[in-house]
Amino acid sequence: MGQKVNPTGLRVGIIRDWEAKWYAEKDFAAYLKEDLQIRKFIEKRLVDASVSTVEIERAANRVNISIHTAKPGMVIGKGGSEVENLRKELNDLTGKRVHINIVEIKKPDLDAKLVGENIARQLEGRVAFRRAMRGTMQRTMRSGAKGIKTQVAGRLNGADMSRVESYAEGTVPLHTLRADIDYAWVEAHTTYGSLGVKTWIYRGEILPEKKQSNGQGGK
């Protein structure tokens, strides 16, 4: 089962947290639609800013958005001008008070979304898929990953028939729930059509903290 299921969804509540931190009964559909609009808007607006994840929290008429990016300077802008413009645009989009928090990604080579985007951009630039995948995987392993697996599907190198090619280095234990595995799917748009790029990165194990018992010895 671990081979088929989304590794992030499988680990939510165990070693991963939700990217949307709110609860609603009557307004659930409206909030979910708004979340999708926010994520789509940020993805288009900050397409060159290496944005990995967007976390959304809600409280009354306020929306707190945490943007995880490898290029915080590009998102913030000179004197905070860019992030202020983004906040105003999101205010108009949602009709709510929006607060934006920028979180820097210290090691972009260990982030599955950014690694996948890197491979996708190379494929769009007509780099051979094997070269793009292997070069990126070696850089990720040098950055401290325990293992990485990449998969590209579509009309590779402009072939008439679409196929799937995958490569792996190190270990990627998909069944181990305490294994910190980052997963992402990215699309590359080439002259021959769209290619799907999947990335799994194993960053080590996250062990649950042992609870200390305050009980005294004896019966």
Curated annotation (Swiss-Prot):
Q: Which Pfam families match?
A: KH_2, Ribosomal_S3_C
Q: Where does the source fall among the domains of life?
A: Bacteria
User: Could you state one GO biological process linked to this protein?
Assistant: translation
**Which positions fall inside the KH type-2 domain?**
38-106
UniProt keyword terms in alphabetical order? Ribonucleoprotein, Ribosomal protein, RNA-binding, rRNA-binding
Q: Which GO terms describe its molecular function?
A: mRNA binding; rRNA binding; structural constituent of ribosome
Naming one, the record's GO cellular component terms include:
cytosolic small ribosomal subunit
Q: Which family does it belong to?
A: Belongs to the universal ribosomal protein uS3 family.
What does this protein do, in the record's words?
Answer: Binds the lower part of the 30S subunit head. Binds mRNA in the 70S ribosome, positioning it for translation.
Description of how the protein assembles with itself and partners? Part of the 30S ribosomal subunit. Forms a tight complex with proteins S10 and S14.
Protein name per its UniProtKB record: Small ribosomal subunit protein uS3
Q: Which gene encodes it?
A: rpsC
